[in-house]
Regions:
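Short leucine-rich amphipathic alpha-helices used at interfaces
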Residues: 12-13, 19-20, 30, 94-95, ...
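N-terminal leader segment of winged-helix/HTH proteins
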Residues: 1-35, 39, 167
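N-terminal helix-turn-helix DNA-binding core of bacterial DNA-binding proteins
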Residues: 27-66
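Terminal interaction helix/tail motif
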Residues: 7, 111-167
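Charged, amphipathic alpha-helical coiled-coil/dimerization segments
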Residues: 75-131
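C-terminal ligand-sensing/allosteric alpha-helical core of TetR-family HTH transcriptional regulators
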Residues: 12-23, 27, 44, 110, ...
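Flexible interhelical turns and helix-capping residues at alpha-helix boundaries
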Residues: 24, 52, 63, 107, ...
Length: 167
């Protein structure tokens, strides 16, 4: 593919990607509403399901909240029965948080429609195309986490610069 072909295609891809991300966020909100939660709750539970039990600090890093905000989040989720705290099997002095699995009914209500719709989409892809998608997501998730860290770092630096200039 020539650079002349690639440029417009990348522009179209960026636009479609933004639309996809918006759809993901909106579905996360709908899933949260279905479960009687807010989107941050769902993202925290997803992080725990993907990583397994985490300390509050480890969860904070994965969901982008401060440690104190994450502690309040975990307190609220624990009271509601969505997570439980327990000793870290590797270091019993530490406490870890783990997600309480959704019931099959909760899982179906919140995520069943998305699973079915995405299965329909994936049915239209060959095995080779699915491998490309897998490779994309495998590389895109860490790239977005790095971009998030860079963006947050830049935002903190900009905030500090504004604060110094205001004196």
């Amino acid at each position: 593919m020539s650079d002349q072909e690639r440029g417009p295609l990348l522009g179209q891809l960026a636009r479609i990607y933004r639309d996809y991300l918006t759809a993901v966020v909106l579905h996360g909100q709908a899933a949260a509403e279905t479960l009687g939660q807010n989107p941050t709750d769902v993202y925290a539970l997803n992080a725990l399901e993907l990583a397994g039990p985490l300390t509050t600090g480890g969860l904070a890093e994965r969901i982008g909240l401060s440690q104190s905000a994450t502690t309040r989040l975990v307190d609220r989720l624990e009271r509601a029965g969505w997570v439980r705290r327990g000793p870290d099997p590797g270091d019993r002095r530490r406490v870890v948080v783990e997600a309480v699995p959704l019931t099959p009914e909760q899982d179906e209500a919140a995520f069943g429609a998305a699973r079915r719709r995405m299965a329909e989409v994936f049915d239209g892809f060959s095995a080779d195309e699915l491998r490309v998608l897998f490779r994309y997501f495998e590389q895109a998730a860490p790239a977005l986490r790095e971009a998030t860290a860079e963006t947050r770092s830049g935002a903190r630096a900009a905030t500090k610069g504004r604060a110094k200039g205001a004196r």
